[in-house]
């Protein structure tokens, strides 16, 4: 009970109310299998949005090839929004991750060499992130940060990469809740 109270910022059992949504730590349903590779190169995580209404790893890969990116999809992971035959919150692993290649998700300095790029399908400058996608993002980030020992301060939005001139992953991305949730693990 103490752990549940701590992760939900409750100081007393009397604060619990009927119908209240609580985070229950250390519970897991079926989850995506995230391939993890022994390396020390990954020191940061950069969160993006695709700024598109729909997408999948296959369609984003094609779009990035059209832009002249020889190795296709610039992100390491993509979280789907339920379009293009995918389910809401489905985590797709990109070929760059499988091959442990540099990303192509930010133009700044050495960030593509040291940062894992995760994109959520959608435009979060126009709307909020659906809960299932948010939960998948939290699961993925917590998995990666734990395995690669990435400190919370090194988990940023694309807009927070020094020298970036973008709103990505969007003004409606729930940063405060995101930071709160990843700190719990």
Placement of each model-derived feature along the sequence:
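Extracellular LysM carbohydrate-binding repeats and other cell-envelope/extracellular binding modules
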Residues: 1-33
